[in-house]
């Protein structure tokens, strides 16, 4: 240990620690993508609560619980994809577990689960409401919404609400897959380097 003002090792000015105290690039990339993946999972949870608010009416009906304020909203009955998408939040535990332990196989399973339980239901929603949204987007200004075949809820086209949800959902799940893929790539490279050594 050197003391301040004490003898200095010949050939160095004391700044050589800058070259020795670097974190490997793969660890930095892994840490950055883990952090971003956790943010994506957080936004997935926020979207889940939006979906849960929509599903509350149907869930309470199935449990035979009557709440006047919720019934007055006249929320449309949910489709199957809404429940499948809501269940996709459970896959987040798999992703968090994989990120915590740097487990390549579990992260790959998480990516497949997000694709099947989150992105495919959103694609179905996108296709299901396409005709309503297209008709709304291309209709004349002089035509009233009530005169069309567009499904209306609270004075607005119902499909437009779902398109907004899908837009945010595609972004969240797209970034989730991107960060998970980056983690898998880095972890595989790191294990390949260990095997090579």
UniProtKB/Swiss-Prot annotation:
Pfam families hit by this protein: Jagunal
Stretches in topological domain Cytoplasmic: 1-39, 100-109, 181-197
Sequence ranges on the Lumenal membrane side: 61-78, 131-159
TM stretches of this protein: 40-60, 79-99, 110-130, 160-180
CC annotations in GO: endoplasmic reticulum membrane
Any one of the GO BP annotations: exocytosis
Superkingdom of the source species: Eukaryota
UniProt topology in membrane: Multi-pass membrane protein
Subcellular location as annotated: Endoplasmic reticulum membrane
Keyword annotations of the record: Developmental protein, Differentiation, Endoplasmic reticulum, Membrane, Oogenesis, Transmembrane, Transmembrane helix
Primary residence: endoplasmic reticulum
Function (record text): Required for endoplasmic reticulum organization and proper vesicular traffic during vitellogenesis. Required for oocyte and bristle growth.
The family this protein is said to belong to: Belongs to the jagunal family.
Xref: PANTHER family: PROTEIN JAGUNAL HOMOLOG 1
Protein's recorded name: Protein jagunal
Source species of the chain: Drosophila pseudoobscura pseudoobscura (Fruit fly)
This protein's encoding gene: jagn
